[in-house]
Amino acid sequence: MSFPDFSASDAQIQWQRFCDLLWYHDDLGLWLDVSRMHLNASELEALQPAMDRAFTAMHELEAGAIANPDEERQVGHYWLRNPQLAPSDDLRTHIAREVDDIEAFGRGVVHGEIKAPSGVPFTDVLWIGIGGSGLGPALMIRALKNNNQGLPFHFLDNVDPNGMSNVLGGLAGRFKTTLVVTVSKSGGTPEPHIGMEQARLKLEAAGGKWAGQAVAITMLNSRLDQQAQQEAWLKRFDMFDWVGGRTSITSAVGLLPGALIGCDIRDFLAGAAQMDEATRVADSRRNPAALMAASWYVAGEGKGRRDMVVLPYRDRLEVFSRYLQQLVMESLGKRLDRDGNVVHQGIAVYGNKGSTDQHAYVQQLRDGVDNFFATFIEELEDSEDIPVIKNERPGDFLDGFLQGTRSALTEGGRQNMTITMRCFDERRLGALVALFERAVGLYGELVNVNAYHQPGVEAGKKAAAAILDLQQRVEEVLQDGVPRTVSEIRQVLDDGSDESIFWIMRHLTGNKRQYNAQGDWSSPAGMRFSKD
């Protein structure tokens, strides 16, 4: 397992290290270079027993073991791109049939064979989903959609009233030909439900027919699935209970957007499957996900002490850093390890795209606090329809900027790795996603956290529900029109906190809800609130 240690000052030693550590997949045309991370041979060797256990755990996960004990669930996103891995014949058949259905439906919509109830082809897609149900589709569209290819996409991925107004307002005049896709695993998540109700109101007011334009992606027999069945929606697709939102991009959640813009979704799945195969190799030096996970571990001392800065040098991948934020941070950001010890694990992720970032925060990366490692992503193949003007090729400049930033960071002792793709298409996107999925899974095993649950998210949902319940009771107290301070409101309720009630009243009075505020906003304890 010998290779030279990192050397910023000796180019020949560093070249040898580059050659020794470079990983390449010929069919995918994909390279991984971790030579500028500070991982050394003795550290990789010391990690090997833990990595062997991680390989075993990943093998058991793929074979159908309960990998999420909190919810007694299997974790099967790897089965989606290789149904033969699924633990039963019924499941293998179901997964394969689902891909066939998605492909056929997408083709029918794109080619105008599946029409809106008005009898004309669909013109737009309104996609309603939160978290992975929004980020995965957004990545698919931004990364793979070409001009005039498939249908335009519009996203409701939040409950911001202004954002919803802008998106829905932009569909004015086309609601009758808009395909509306609602994604909710349980069918009970508030954000997609609220977005769906707002979209339905606008669509029906414009003369559209909801059932003939609505598609659901949800678990079988969920609240949303039952509604879609009862109302005879246009189409329903499965969101399996063994697929988490952050790893759902190779399910209907990611495949349907791809199909609706005319992508080859089977190539996307094939790329993910190829990378899955490459990352099953039980030799860290020949396994790109293991090299990444080991590099992350050593860089952050096994405690997540360095952030991951994602720098893709392609506009198509500008959403990728946000996609990785959820994949990495929701998977690894845990208070407890599997043994119940308080560990506060995690890796913070941020980024945008090159070379834009060189004119933004790269200044700090080069000269500021050394608390990160960078991940460069590049594509070699340039678009042929951008001409050479005055002997200037945009792609040459982009490559020069990437190499220059990489060199500047390395000279400053800042760790970085680079993923290079010969070209970028559905297959490479699938491979890229699968590479990070496996690296996250292996790293989770190295630090002994459950990478497949999200108790913090659930805690946030419960806290939000409590606030909404408190708001309802605050409004009931104020029905009598008597002005009260927040403390007096709390005393009537015998519940809540003054600060929470103040936040609620500030929100209510900031909108046309017939609530009044008297007093000085800079002295909240003395403010009095009432209803007309």
From Swiss-Prot:
EC number annotated for this UniProt entry: 5.3.1.9
Catalysed reactions, as listed in the record: alpha-D-glucose 6-phosphate = beta-D-fructose 6-phosphate
GO molecular function: carbohydrate derivative binding; glucose-6-phosphate isomerase activity; monosaccharide binding
Coiled coil ranges: none
One GO CC annotation: cytosol
Record-annotated active site: 330, 359, 461
Pfam families: PGI
Matching SUPFAM superfamilies: SIS domain (SSF53697)
InterPro entries reported for this sequence: G6P_Isomerase, Phosphoglucose_isomerase_CS, SIS_dom_sf, SIS_PGI_1, SIS_PGI_2
CDD domains given in the database record: SIS_PGI_1 (cd05015), SIS_PGI_2 (cd05016)
Gene3D superfamilies cross-referenced by the UniProt entry: Glucose-6-phosphate isomerase like protein, domain 1 (3.40.50.10490)
HAMAP family the UniProt entry points to: G6P_isomerase (MF_00473)
Family indicated by similarity: Belongs to the GPI family.
Name of the protein in question: Glucose-6-phosphate isomerase
Organism: Synechococcus sp. (strain CC9902)
